[in-house]
Curated annotation (Swiss-Prot):
<keyword id="KW-0067">ATP-binding</keyword>
<dbReference type="GO" id="GO:0005524">
    <property type="term" value="F:ATP binding"/>
</dbReference>
<feature type="transmembrane region" description="Helical">
    <location>
        <begin position="451"/>
        <end position="471"/>
    </location>
</feature>
<feature type="transmembrane region" description="Helical">
    <location>
        <begin position="474"/>
        <end position="494"/>
    </location>
</feature>
<dbReference type="GO" id="GO:0005471">
    <property type="term" value="F:ATP:ADP antiporter activity"/>
</dbReference>
<feature type="transmembrane region" description="Helical">
    <location>
        <begin position="67"/>
        <end position="87"/>
    </location>
</feature>
<keyword id="KW-0472">Membrane</keyword>
<keyword id="KW-0812">Transmembrane</keyword>
<dbReference type="InterPro" id="IPR004667">
    <property type="entry name" value="ADP_ATP_car_bac_type"/>
</dbReference>
<feature type="transmembrane region" description="Helical">
    <location>
        <begin position="357"/>
        <end position="377"/>
    </location>
</feature>
<feature type="transmembrane region" description="Helical">
    <location>
        <begin position="231"/>
        <end position="251"/>
    </location>
</feature>
<feature type="transmembrane region" description="Helical">
    <location>
        <begin position="130"/>
        <end position="150"/>
    </location>
</feature>
<feature type="transmembrane region" description="Helical">
    <location>
        <begin position="154"/>
        <end position="174"/>
    </location>
</feature>
<feature type="transmembrane region" description="Helical">
    <location>
        <begin position="333"/>
        <end position="353"/>
    </location>
</feature>
<dbReference type="GO" id="GO:0005886">
    <property type="term" value="C:plasma membrane"/>
</dbReference>
<feature type="transmembrane region" description="Helical">
    <location>
        <begin position="99"/>
        <end position="119"/>
    </location>
</feature>
<dbReference type="Pfam" id="PF03219">
    <property type="entry name" value="TLC"/>
</dbReference>
Amino acid sequence: MNIVDSNCTIWHKARNSKFRHIVWPIRSYELTKFIPMTLLMFFILLNQNLVRSIKDSFVVTLISSEVLSFIKLWGEMPMGVLFVILYSKLCNIMTTEQVFRIITSTFLFFFAIFGFILFPYKEFFHPNPELINQYIIVLPHLKWFLIIWGQWSLVLFYIMGELWPVIVFTLLYWQLANKITKVEEAPRFYSFFTLFGQTNLLFSGTVIIYFAKSEHFLLPLFAHLNDTNEILLKSFITVILISGLICLALHKLIDKSVVEADKNIKFKNQRTDILKLSLLESAKIILTSRYLGFICLLVMSYSMSINLIEGLWMSKVKQLYPATKDFISYHGEVLFWTGVLTLVSAFLGSSLIRIYGWFWGAIITPIMMFVAGVMFFSFTIFEQHLGNIVNTLGYSSPLVIIVFIGGLWHVFAKSVKYSLFDATKEMVYIPLDNEIKTKGKAAVDVMGAKIGKSIGAIIQFISFSIFPNAVHNDIAGLLMVTFIIVCILWLYGVKVLSQNYNKMIKR
């Protein structure tokens, strides 16, 4: 009996030890909420990574990296604005759970249409390439708009692929997480949501590399096809649709087991979370909120800094890997190593936020982004002077080391974003009231990201419009100066927001 009591005492002490709270702060009774939310994040991010790899690889190799800035400015920004309007109106007539399922299903439907109809029959749906070339000769300053018109379905897929992480993950998923997570649970839950959800980076990176090879298990379904790009696309879309259906099933489970249980309400039409304020009333609250303004600054800074480097990096990757299959395989390798570093930084980040507070968790992302970004720009600008360094390191050309540093920047930028930026950004919404938390979050997350990308895209848009034959290398110096300014503003925004957040928590 004494042995049993002794074992129970040891087990009780172990469960309540400081070490246990650091390594695994989730309680057993919280697992019914924690596990479904973690799995939902995993499959949403799996689709995000697969779609991102497809859209980047296909657009860059089949069109050009220079066209990306035009798509972000004239495609993503208008679509982001329209979505905020649509989303706010849907929230006034539906529950947020219904909005999640409708929007996610719409994305999946479009991906299926593109993969199995629009791309395979692009010659039928797209204008004649010779006609596009004739217009470019006559209107050289509209060159990139004409190229977009000539590949409109691929461009639309790129836009929808860019909106998936912003809308489905950043807005809808985290809105659900904020809704069912208590303030005292957030520091423990959010970093571990990321820790387990982001393991899909390892999985999706492996999946991408696997499908980029000549042999995979879906190949017999598409054995009759001759176009390797079409086979690649249909294989990925099949996986995306399966993953999307799992997301819908998990969301339904969370809706029934967690949301309904928390509210203890039997009928959906009795829910209290349906928002009745108008879009104009919501906009007034958002625009007059200094607190939301600084959250928006953080989102804009991250999006803009990524946009300033991304096009230049992809142009270098295309030079090294001109074939779509090789390009997407490289993308898979970068994703895999992003996953490795994300898991490490998410584990450390959870302890960092709990021990040192929100500020230190939030400041790491801009610091890492700045250091890695400046390295990449410097090596790119001085590419012609890297001969001795390249020979010393044993590389065949400066391009190889530049692509390596660009990949390193991407790994660092994305890993700290996934593990720290997302978690700390979502924590600052929790003290807000329901109106700001829902509609304010929609405006900040969607508009902030799109405006940030658009500002970076404007610089590139103007450059490529005035000089139609220019490429990313020609404007690398301008991009670097802008990048440094953005990072400085980002650091300032973190400092001010930290002060405001701590005041609201104390209240």
